[in-house]
């Protein structure tokens, strides 16, 4: 079983503290007291040095975002045997809102995540980047497995060690979004993948259109994984009170 620990102080930045095997209550307390968290949904505009999940152009032309927690809601979905946790964010200057949603399936050991974006600005806000999710993966001997190919040769397994720089898996073919690549990856945390041993993290984007998966490895201690709709030539003008929901990862 896996476990995701989040910190969402009112007025502060939402952070991911831990993702991995289930821990004891004592370990959870220790992690919450000592862990240095990573921004749960990094946005563009306030000095964040790595790849961002969200960037926008406000109605007045400004590109800056600075999101803060305004609430947390948790709902038990009995019929689905799942728990839905929603971290509500608001920009510190603009009436711009983001909900980070986590749906934990208790019987499948799967955590589904997506975002819901809306605003109350006077004119439309242009969404220029809108990833579904962000996951930091601790650097080490981490390998990436993904599928590639071409016509009549689809689904070829590619395995590679993650190196400094950017790794991008994307599609711009529309309805043919699984011919040359797939929106699914698997991270092997203990070196080159083995059939019967080792820790892995799997991720699949539930989207039938153009997608982009990014892995940004810089000078810090993390591989920064982001996945969502491919925003190239696809900026979206979000109307006031309209809700833009990203596909689930």
Language model features with spans:
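Polysaccharide-binding surfaces and accessory modules of carbohydrate-active proteins
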Residues: 2-216, 222-223, 232-235
């Amino acid at each position: 079983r896996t476990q995701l620990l989040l910190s969402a102080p009112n007025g502060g930045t939402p952070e991911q503290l831990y993702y991995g095997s289930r821990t004891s209550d004592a370990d959870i307390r220790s992690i919450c007291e000592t862990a240095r968290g990573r921004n749960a949904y990094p946005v563009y505009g306030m000095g964040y040095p790595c790849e961002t999940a969200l960037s926008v152009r406000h109605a007045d032309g400004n590109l800056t975002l600075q999101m803060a927690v305004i609430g947390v809601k948790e709902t038990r979905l009995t019929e689905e045997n799942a728990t839905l946790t929603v971290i509500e964010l608001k920009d510190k200057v603009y009436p711009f809102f983001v909900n980070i949603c986590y749906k934990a399936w208790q019987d499948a050991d799967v955590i589904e995540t997506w975002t819901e974006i809306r605003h109350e600005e006077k004119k439309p806000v242009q969404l220029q980047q809108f990833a579904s999710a962000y996951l930091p993966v601790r650097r080490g001997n981490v390998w990436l497995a993904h599928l590639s190919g071409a016509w009549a040769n689809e689904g070829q397994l590619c395995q590679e060690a993650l190196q400094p720089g950017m790794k991008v898996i994307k599609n711009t073919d529309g309805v043919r979004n699984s011919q040359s690549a797939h929106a699914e990856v698997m991270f092997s945390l203990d070196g080159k993948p083995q059939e019967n041993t080792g820790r892995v993290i799997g991720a699949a984007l539930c989207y039938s259109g153009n997608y982009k998966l990014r892995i940004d490895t810089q000078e810090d201690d993390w591989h920064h994984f982001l996945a969502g709709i491919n925003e190239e030539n696809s900026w979206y003008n979000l109307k006031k009170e309209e809700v833009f929901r990203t596909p689930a990862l």
